[in-house]
């Protein structure tokens, strides 16, 4: 991120660095994302029901999945997850600087206002997920497969089979199921992540003794993850439930109301800890990788010029 200046890398190079960094973050943290999705899709026990919830907490959920389904199940959905990050990560992160510069004007000098950073994050998050929604849908569907009883036939044999099966059985439009809450979620979370990283990094660099190094990137990444989860959890829960149980809800508002009535307001923060564990670590890994990837590309460009 460049807090106030113009990007010193071309758009294709920025896109490539962003997509690569997002994919690294995805591979490293998808077990936590799988745990988050399972917790969000788990319905609260009915009043008087003695059945205890199957999944309890981040580590408990990860352990249960690994024990009952094998370690590989923790990476279920990694293929569409990487598809998603190549498209969505590359677009939302790669376009952030150009869009931010567009909003402030080419002749702007100084620190970019926080409002412009937020607006740029909302814009690139919304545009990016409109393209990448099918990959998000398939990822959630594959992660939700573990809800099926032991021995029950699986709907999909893999990512490509999931795409074709959904199109064949539900139509092409089904690939954009949950687009409304997904656009809202990703626009909000993207703005929270990128704007907060930008702002926190800019603030830290003004403190004597701090430089643009790994420590600054880690602190900024943790701040980005925290703000993203606090702001985006409710719409994230709605998105996961709509994509995981597509026939149970008529739309975004219907899903919100039914969730509120059946599970109460705290249901919108179900999985908060694993969500923060995932997004906090994802942001640290992604931004560290992004900063190093950009540094490497700059050095490579400089060596070619010399």
Swiss-Prot record:
PROSITE patterns: SOLCAR. Keywords: Membrane, Mitochondrion, Mitochondrion inner membrane, Repeat, Stress response, Transmembrane, Transmembrane helix, Transport. It comes from the Eukaryota. Its main location: mitochondrion. GO terms for cellular component: cytosol; mitochondrial inner membrane; mitochondrion; plant-type vacuole; plasmodesma. Disruption phenotype: Slight reduction of shoot mass. The keyword Transport applies. The chain crosses the membrane at residues 15-35, 71-91, 118-138, 177-197, 218-238, 269-289. SUPFAM superfamilies: Mitochondrial carrier (SSF103506). Induction: By cold stress, high light and chloramphenicol. One of its GO terms (biological process) is photorespiration. Widely expressed. GO terms for molecular function: amino acid transmembrane transporter activity; oxidative phosphorylation uncoupler activity. It is found in: Mitochondrion inner membrane. Belongs to the mitochondrial carrier (TC 2.A.29) family. PUMPS are mitochondrial transporter proteins that create proton leaks across the inner mitochondrial membrane, thus uncoupling oxidative phosphorylation. This leads to a decrease in the efficiency of oxidative phosphorylation and an increase in heat production. Is involved in protecting plant cells against oxidative stress damage and maintaining the redox balance of the mitochondrial electron transport chain to facilitate photosynthetic metabolism. May play a regulatory role during photorespiration. PANTHER family: MITOCHONDRIAL DICARBOXYLATE CARRIER-RELATED. Over-expression of Arabidopsis UCP1 in tobacco plants increases tolerance to oxidative stress caused by exogenous hydrogen peroxide, or by drought and salt. This is Mitochondrial uncoupling protein 1. It comes from Arabidopsis thaliana. The lineage of its organism: Eukaryota, Viridiplantae, Streptophyta, Embryophyta, Tracheophyta.
């Amino acid at each position: 991120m460049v807090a106030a200046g113009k990007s010193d890398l071309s758009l294709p190079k920025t896109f490539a660095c962003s997509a690569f960094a997002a994919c690294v973050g995805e591979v490293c943290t998808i077990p936590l994302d799988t745990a988050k999705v399972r917790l969000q899709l788990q319905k609260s026990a009915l009043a008087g029901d003695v059945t205890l919830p199957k999944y309890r907490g981040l580590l408990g959920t990860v352990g249960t999945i690994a024990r009952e389904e094998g370690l590989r199940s923790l990476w279920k959905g990694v293929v569409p997850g990487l598809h998603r990050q190549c498209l969505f990560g590359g677009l939302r992160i790669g376009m952030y600087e150009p869009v931010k510069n567009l909003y402030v004007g080419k002749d702007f000098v100084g620190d970019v206002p926080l409002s412009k950073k937020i607006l740029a994050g909302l814009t690139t998050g919304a545009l990016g997920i409109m393209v990448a929604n099918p990959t998000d849908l398939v990822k959630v569907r594959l992660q939700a497969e573990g809800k099926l009883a032991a021995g029950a036939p699986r709907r999909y044999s893999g990512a490509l089979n999931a795409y074709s099966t959904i199109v064949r059985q539900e139509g092409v439009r089904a690939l954009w199921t949950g687009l409304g809450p997904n656009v809202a979620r990703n626009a909000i979370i993207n703005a929270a992540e990128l704007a907060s990283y930008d702002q926190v990094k800019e603030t830290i660099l003004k403190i004597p003794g701090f430089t643009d190094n790994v420590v600054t990137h880690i602190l900024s990444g943790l701040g980005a993850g925290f703000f993203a989860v606090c702001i985006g959890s409710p719409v994230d829960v709605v998105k996961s439930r709509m994509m995981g149980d597509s026939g149970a809800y008529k739309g975004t508002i219907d899903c919100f109301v039914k969730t509120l009535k059946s599970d109460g307001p705290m249901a919108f923060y179900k999985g908060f800890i694993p969500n923060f564990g995932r997004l906090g670590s994802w942001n640290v890994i992604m931004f560290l990788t992004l900063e190093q990837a950009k540094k490497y590309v700059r050095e490579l460009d400089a060596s070619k010029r010399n």
